[in-house]
Amino acid sequence: AEGKIIEILGNVGDVGLEILSIIKQNDLPLEFPPQVIEASKRVPKSIKQSELEGRRDLRDLPIVTVDGDDAKDLDDAVYVKQLGKDEFLLGVHIADVSYYVKENAVLDKEARERGTSVYLVDRVLPMLPERLSNGICSLNAGEDRLTMSCEMHIDRKGRILSYEIFPSVIHVRHRLSYRIVREILVNGDEELAQKYEQLFHQPEAFLKLGNRLLVLPVPDEPPAEKPRTKPPAEHDR
């Protein structure tokens, strides 16, 4: 059998060589094609007032993201409020990527080809160019972002009483990490709790709801109740 060198990745001992070898062995794409980069440049860096039409404005809510310390593409955010002794409101907000990435367009085809973002020890191979994944499609703190939201009313046993899915616009107040949330809710860090007082004015609500949901089985079917088509009453938020 004969073989030939098709590419030299580096020298033995080079930093990152092992990771690069894994990338090559699995035929993972390192770069985006020029046409994909060009398409990403045509996507705006911020949203316009006209784009808010038909979306529910949730920018007044203290919504936060909770991710790893090194995460850059923040695609989901949450808000929770205890409505009464036996009921919580949980809002989950997902970046509305489909608003910017149209079906069968260049960006969509590239994302389908990649299938997912790949997280390695020293880098991330994103499904979309960083201008989108870390920019307008990332729920960065202090920025208005277009989202798809699901608001759920959950009882004290963790059962979903009702839910509603709708297009929205949010303004993330803080970028939290799992470490920060753990320090506040589990370890009782008073300094951090004071810093994020507005968000954790009901820390027991976060903790109680989190404990309920962690032990729930994942249902095969969504709740029987259909999503509401009208906005919830003001007291729901």
Q: What residue ranges belong to the model's regions?
A:
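A glycine-rich phosphate-binding loop feature that marks nucleotide/adenosyl-phosphate handling sites
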Residues: I6-I8, P167-V169, A224
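Charge-lined substrate channels and their catalytic hotspots, especially those that engage the 3′ end
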Residues: A1-G91, S98-E143, R182, Q198, ...
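Residue-level recognition of well-ordered beta-strand positions that form the cores
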Residues: Y79, G91-H93, E151-H153, R212
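Conserved catalytic alpha/beta cores of large enzymes that bind or transform nucleotide phosphates
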Residues: S117-G210
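Short, mixed-charge, low-aromatic patches
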Residues: F32-P34, A105-L107, L161-F166, L209-L213
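N-terminal low-complexity segments that are often proline-rich with Ser/Thr-Pro
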Residues: H201-R237
